[in-house]
Design a protein with these regions (language model features):
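Short S/T/G/P-rich N-terminal loop/turn motif that feeds into the first structured element of a domain
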Residues: 1-55, 63-69, 96-97
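C-terminal structural segments of small proteins and small subunits
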Residues: 62-93
Length: 97
């Protein structure tokens, strides 16, 4: 199995209730069930007030690297990426477990 973690940092001045952010969250929330390669899917807002913390996280799992690649290339995923690109930056980590 492959774990795919994504941590998002909202751009300066962008808040969680910004309509673009709300749309972006919903775009990713709705991926579960649309992309059959997803084996595990959870996402949520950070609770920590530490300055090093990121704002939003996605924790997902896939059977193998081919399934992860299918997910990454999927048009629904790419549409979500395009939304988030407008108001955030992010880091990822992919590892076997």
């Amino acid at each position: 199995m492959i774990r795919h973690l994504v941590l998002f940092k909202l751009d300066e001045g962008v808040e969680r209730d910004d309509p673009r952010v709300v749309e972006g969250v919903e775009a990713f929330r709705s991926l579960e069930g649309k992309i059959p390669e997803i084996r595990h899917w959870e996402l949520g807002w950070n609770l920590s007030d530490r300055p090093i913390a990121y704002d939003f996280a996605i924790n997902s799992a896939f059977d193998d690297q081919a399934a992860l690649r299918t997910y990454v290339d999927h048009p629904e995923h790419q549409a979500g990426v395009a939304l988030w690109r407008e108001f955030s930056s992010w880091v990822i980590a992919d590892y076997e477990f």
